Amino acid sequence: MKRGARGDLKRVDLKGCIRVKGKSYISIVMVFLLLGCTSYPAARKEASPPPSKEMGRAFVREALQHYQFVKDPDVVNLVNSVGRRIVSKVGANPDSYHFFVVRENQPNAFAIPGGYIFIFDGLLLQLRDEGELAGVLAHEIAHVERSHFFKDDKKIAALDIATIAAILLSGGNPAALTLAGAANLDIRLQFSRDNEAEADSYAMRYLEKGGFSSEGLLNFFDSLIRYERFNPQTVPAYASTHPGLEERRDRVANFLRKTSDTPDTGTGTGITRNWQRMQATLLSRNITLKDESTLLQAMMIEKMPEEKREEALNYLLGLAYMKAGRYSDAIPRYLTAIGLNENNHLYYADIAFCYLKQQDIDKSREAAIKSILLSRDYAPAHVIMGIIELDSDNLTKAISHLDDALKIDEANSMANFYLAMAYRKSSDAGKEAFYSARYFKLNLDPERALKELNRAKDLVTIDTPMHFRILQEIEEIKREGL
């Protein structure tokens, strides 16, 4: 759902990618608004959030007014999975971290206090595999965990959240800074070389603990160096205050050489199916027929085993066309992929969605059922069946399928959306409000989520599991900001 939309829930597209406003910058920046250490106490109703969380929440509120986010689960789930995997292994609380994917062409990522990490899709498109993504996120997590500061704490403390957000969102653009009233202030957001070096050092430790190859950070620097060489005009002025990418790259390479006698047991940097799905999703917004070869090159089809290339080629082109809303172009590609491999549940779930969008319900149902028979652990197929049953007023079956989807992936926004619709049809206003709230929360609209949760709280029976769950959701939004 696009931000700014108001009113009752209505059917929305499952693609979930939204355009972005504004500029950014190439350097990896870490935004800290505090003068103290970040802490993660156990959540209690009566406890106030730590100062880092309060400042982070304030920044997120401001960011939601300037950024627009990629919400497609094929993108968001992968970033969350990699990020939470690292956080869980370094002694931090994974529930205190939030990962955002911003729709912006510039390669960039940054962290703010309290565990809020932003990565731009322009950076995701420059990375080559999950190992490099892990390197990016490990570096930002290290900034949070090591409680790094701006160079001039007193000057930073004098800036308000809106000004800091304006500086970061301007991408160093002088005109934008002037309009934001932040001209000549971006110098206050410079980072120390020691902090950047320490973040790199800890990132390598975090990668090892998380089961990723330590070379992920090195490969990430190589990707940024390539981008910088081909796009020198996009590097903002204050990026020079950070250690140069090549200097940082050499330092990491030297460290890895010194420890080369220790076996690296982390995950390699192979291109996974999930990574290719993410890349196809991000590339789909501008796809045309003449772009097919470019898209396939970006997803490195040539590096796949030769016997798998034709299947992968048709599958990924079908996926890109589906994400672009070009269902008539997607279906023949999926049919070819299915002809080459009739046992892949993803192909059937995706083509079921295409048929659903074309209102070919019989074919959609058949393909969704086939996907579920091949794998009961893929939420989108259950969502499609839930939608079909809901449209036929088979509410019991619809709720069953949508519940199954949430058991697999509780963050599936469409399962929450259609459950709200199902409970509306069944006149269960309390559950309708609860699942509406979950939908709004997952779509980064915490204000509407809180409104629906408070409505749900007044509609359900007190001291029931649903009542306690509603209270828990309310507490979490107030504590985390979303």
For each of these PLM feature ranges, what is it?
Residues 303, 337, 370-371, 404-405, ...:
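Canonical positions in the second alpha-helix
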Residues 42-47, 57, 69, 77, ...:
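Extracytoplasmic and endomembrane cell-envelope/extracellular-matrix remodeling and assembly machinery
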Residues 311, 345-346, 379-380, 413-414, ...:
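Helix-start (N-cap) detector for alpha-helical repeat units in TPR-like alpha-solenoids
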